Swiss-Prot record:
Signal peptide residue numbers: none
Alphabetical list of PANTHER family matching this protein: PROTEIN FAM25A-RELATED (PTHR34994:SF1)
Family matches, as InterPro entries: FAM25
Family statement drawn from the similarity comment of this UniProt entry: Belongs to the FAM25 family.
Species annotation: Homo sapiens
Protein name in UniProt: Protein FAM25A
Pfam families linked: FAM25
Length: 89
């Protein structure tokens, strides 16, 4: 009789252990999903910020280059006009 009770108790303990393990696995899966979601979101924000800074830097460089080219062309035209004016005098 006690052997049957021991076997029944062992089966009950095994069943409770299995259910507890399944619950723990489910909880860990949820935590992992949440952590991965936060990591993905953080990574996406970091990439977006890096792209934004690169674009701003590129825009600034393009503005500087445009100003330099404009000034160079303006100076060349002014110099040419002054030279032509001197030739005409």
């Amino acid at each position: 009789m006690l052997g049957g009770l021991g076997k029944l108790a062992a089966e009950g303990l095994a069943h409770r252990t299995e259910k507890a393990t399944e619950g723990a696995i489910h909880a860990v899966e949820e935590v992992v999903k949440e952590v991965v979601g936060h990591a993905k979101e953080t990574g996406e924000k970091a990439i977006a910020e890096a792209i934004k800074k690169a674009q701003e830097s590129g825009d600034k460089k393009m503005k500087e280059i445009t100003e330099t080219v404009t000034n160079t062309v303006t100076n060349a035209i002014t110099h040419a006009a002054e030279s032509l004016d001197k030739l005409g005098q």
